[in-house]
Design a protein with these regions (language model features):
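Short helix-capping segments at alpha-helix termini
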Residues: 23-26, 51-57, 156, 178-180
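Internal, well-ordered domain-core segments that constitute the primary functional module
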Residues: 125-198, 202
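NAD(P)+-binding Rossmann beta1-loop-alpha1 motif at the extreme N-terminus of oxidoreductases
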Residues: 1-49
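Residues at the starts of beta-strands that form the adenosine-phosphate
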Residues: 2, 29-30, 60, 137, ...
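Short acidic/histidine-rich motifs immediately flanking catalytic phosphotransfer sites
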Residues: 73-75, 135
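Long, compositionally biased stretches enriched for glycine and/or charged residues
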Residues: 179-263
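Conserved N-terminal Rossmann-fold NAD(P) cofactor-binding segment
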Residues: 38-73, 80-89
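Rossmann-fold NAD(P)-binding glycine/threonine-rich loop
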Residues: 83, 87-155
């Protein structure tokens, strides 16, 4: 079975690590990397191949500089692309800040600018997948995930799901705080990508969220992702907020801090 990684960026080694760890449950023969930056593609292929071998992965890692060849016959496609790369990201973040507006890749005008660059590229890849890998499942990690997924569903017939590691990170944090295995803790997350809340934490059928919220200061001391929020705010909403909601709950403060950091 073939899997293609669209975008050979910093996420590639993490994806390969997960694939290697789950290899016993996968019938994966090869992972093919594709990127529009030839130098980065060669570098990440060499790095990924070295890591995969050191992890004992049963699949090969190679690259294809041509998107059609990279995607042809793939059973799964993992997408993590950034059209314009870091130079465009810097513009997305800096221009809004000059006008007192948050600049961020999924929020406000910066997020919209990224969407304008990303949607045409992702729709084009989706249409290519339709043609050369019609049975593939596209797993999209490309931001802004929500609007990119809407575009894929509206303008292609490719099977696609959007993912984010945020909710999993939140669930893992709560499980560790409660001193329980992650598999024993079911966290109900409601909302959109980078805009959601955990509204229930089930352990053996019992909702432990009220306890977690009552002890929120203790939770904050165990994981920095909660440090942004005032405990009284969390108690007033009765849910655990995704860290990106900081940019909504504390917009003016966020803009001030980003400006002050010089980044």
């Amino acid at each position: 079975m073939k899997m293609t990684l669209l975008g050979a960026g910093v996420r590639a080694p993490f994806v390969l690590r997960g694939l290697a760890a789950g290899a016993a449950d996968l019938d994966l023969d090869e992972v093919v990397l594709f990127d529009t930056d030839p130098e980065r593609l060669e570098l990440m292929t060499a790095l990924g191949g070295h890591f995969a071998a050191s992890w004992g992965a049963p699949f090969t890692v190679r690259n294809e500089p041509d998107a059609e060849s990279a995607l042809a016959g793939a059973r799964f496609v993992f997408s993590a692309i950034r059209p314009g790369q870091e130079a465009a990201r810097a513009v997305d973040e800096e221009v809004p800040l000059k006008h007192g507006v948050l600049g961020q890749e999924t929020t406000g005008p910066g997020g919209f600018a990224m969407a304008l660059r990303t949607i045409p590229a992702m729709v084009a890849y989706g249409q290519l997948i339709e043609r050369v890998a019609p049975n593939a499942l596209l797993v999209n990690f490309t931001n802004p995930v929500g609007i990119v997924m809407q575009a894929l569903h509206d303008h292609t017939s490719v099977r696609a799901i959007g993912i984010c590691d945020g909710p999993i990170s939140m669930q893992r944090s709560v499980a560790e705080f409660l001193g329980l295995p992650r598999e024993q803790v079911h966290a109900d997350y409601a909302g959109l990508n980078h805009c959601g809340w955990i509204h229930r934490v089930l352990v053996d059928g019992e909702d432990r969220l009220p306890e977690v919220i009552d002890r929120f200061e203790e939770l904050q001391a165990t994981d920095d992702q909660w440090a942004l929020f005032d405990p009284e705010l969390v108690r007033s909403i009765g849910m655990l907020p995704m860290e990106y909601l900081y940019f909504y709950y504390y917009r003016d403060t966020a803009v001030e801090h980003i400006r002050g950091s010089g980044s």
